Regions:
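Surface-exposed, charge/polar-rich loops and edge strands
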Residues: 1-355
Length: 355
């Protein structure tokens, strides 16, 4: 198996630059176990869910983690993308320390000060670069609220923007369209995009049919956008993400399996959470545990019986994950069929359900 086996040609015109509206009006490709394909609309997903099935969603929410401001002293424009809070660092309402990607990197050395203003031009948040991480060049930045912002979190919501994937370059719409309707805890740098297609009304109809809904919380990092550059995919260093599987979800999975019904994961992040929590054989509750689980063909799924997902980037670990569930040939054939039928790809794109 080579990384090139998961490569495919995709002209830029196939990359969705805006979400479908309504959310559940996007296309849905249903992939059967034998490779047969059906072309539906996403709201028809209810036809493939049975009473007693369990739908597992990732309720994480994307942080307003993109900060645009100025360097104190020179006034030069700066951009700061929050990655994750620094381990063991101060974390209070009045001060937080984050690992960040910054632009322009060469000008933001330890001691550099940044300020971020709200829409009225008032300084709401200060940032001070305190260190540079040698492994990736990220900056450690201490954030403190200013003016009428009583906390760092409030200041971030006043000045921060929702970060979009690098391949979405044209979207100027509502940031809420890059959040799922059931999102709760703000800790992610990217959305669990398979869930973007669900509306509250569709979820209610699904529940009324007798399908249960359970949650996990995987904090999506920027590593989700990394492609595999090594010729041998096994040599790829998988990124770490934190995930939570509540006891209520563990109980729901066990009850569903015992009754002979299916566990259907919404998105690769839900897959990764459930399979990571069952890595030792039995599914166990987890609270912000770290996972480096790398699912590729040859992996035996322990929990998940069906996957709802989007169309993924070439040479990505996510494409390998879905190929491990079905097969590489079936998935790659489905992708070619999607192109022939003008499906839209990636985060704002159309959906696929692997049965």
């Amino acid at each position: 198996m080579r990384t090139a086996d998961f490569d495919y040609d995709l002209p830029e015109s196939y990359i969705a630059q805006a979400p479908a509206y309504p959310r559940d009006s996007c296309k849905l490709m249903v992939v059967h176990k034998d490779g047969a394909l059906e072309h539906r609309i996403f709201r028809d997903v209810i036809d493939y869910l049975n009473p007693g099935d369990l739908l597992v969603v990732n309720e994480t929410r994307v942080l307003p983690a993109r900060l645009l401001g100025n360097k104190v002293g020179t006034g030069g424009a700066v951009e700061c993308l929050l990655l994750n809070k620094s381990e063991g660092a101060t974390d209070t309402a009045a001060e937080q320390t984050w690992e960040c990607l910054v632009k322009p990197g060469k000008r933001l050395k330890p001691g550099a000060l940044m300020e971020f203003k709200d829409a009225d031009g008032r300084v709401i948040l200060h940032g001070e670069v305190t260190d540079i991480l040698p492994e990736n060049g990220a900056r450690v930045v201490r954030l403190t609220p200013q003016g009428n912002a009583v906390s760092v979190d409030l200041a971030m919501h006043l000045v921060g923007r929702t970060p979009l994937p690098p391949y979405i370059t044209e979207y100027k719409g509502d940031d809420e369209m890059y959040q799922t309707v059931y999102s709760k805890t703000e800790r992610s740098a990217a959305a669990p995009t398979a869930g973007l297609h669900f509306t509250k009304e569709l979820l209610e109809r699904i529940k009324e049919k007798g399908v249960r809904v359970a949650t996990v919380d995987l904090e999506v990092g920027l590593g989700t956008f990394r492609t595999v550059n090594e010729d041998d995919p096994a040599e790829h260093d998988m990124h770490v993400e934190l995930y939570t599987v509540p006891q209520a979800t563990v109980d729901a999975v066990r009850e569903t399996k015992a009754a002979g019904h299916r566990v259907i994961a919404v998105g690769t992040t839900s897959v990764r959470s459930l399979e990571s929590a069952a890595a030792d054989g039995e599914l166990e509750a987890k609270n912000r545990a770290a996972t480096k689980l790398y699912i590729m063909p040859g992996y035996e799924y322990k929990v998940v019986d069906s996957i709802i997902t989007n169309f993924h980037v070439p040479r990505s670990t996510l494409l390998m994950l879905v190929s491990a569930f079905s097969s590489r040939d079936i998935v790659m054939n489905a992708y070619e069929e999607a192109k022939r039928n003008d499906y839209r790809f990636f985060s704002f794109g159309d959906s696929m359900m692997l049965l």
